[in-house]
């Protein structure tokens, strides 16, 4: 059966299926307690007097495969919202467990901390936020996504 399917599907279709399966394996719903602990630690780092937004917070404005005219990039979302790093930090401090979506393994480095995904409503639009604490000891936060959601999200495990 697999041989027939492989003969019928194009290489592109196979790649898409493989990516989808890999993504499904990398997703999980963390317990309510785990999400609460993550949010407490995130807020603790941000509220620490030693936290320096320019040294301790990184954001990926544009991924390699994104085009400049893509409305769903972090860079273009920030422009449309008239946001800077301080606004992102403010929104991270305001995250609630009810806005949690899922937890993802960092596929580029499975041994690094996981990404935590949230959807926050800003100016009547859903904003997709994917963030991790890179290092608790060094107090580093990495936000890989802060952009308008490409699709409406309605599945909030604790919302």
Language-model features: locations:
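Tryptophan (W) side chains
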Residues: 2-4
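Functional cores of ribonucleases/endoribonucleases
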Residues: 93-140
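Compact soluble domain cores
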Residues: 24-112
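Compositionally biased, intrinsically disordered low-complexity regions enriched in proline and serine
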Residues: 13-14, 84, 101, 159
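Short, positively charged and aromatic/hydrophobic N-terminal segments
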Residues: 7-10, 14-20, 59
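Enriched for short, Lys/Arg-rich terminal
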Residues: 133-159
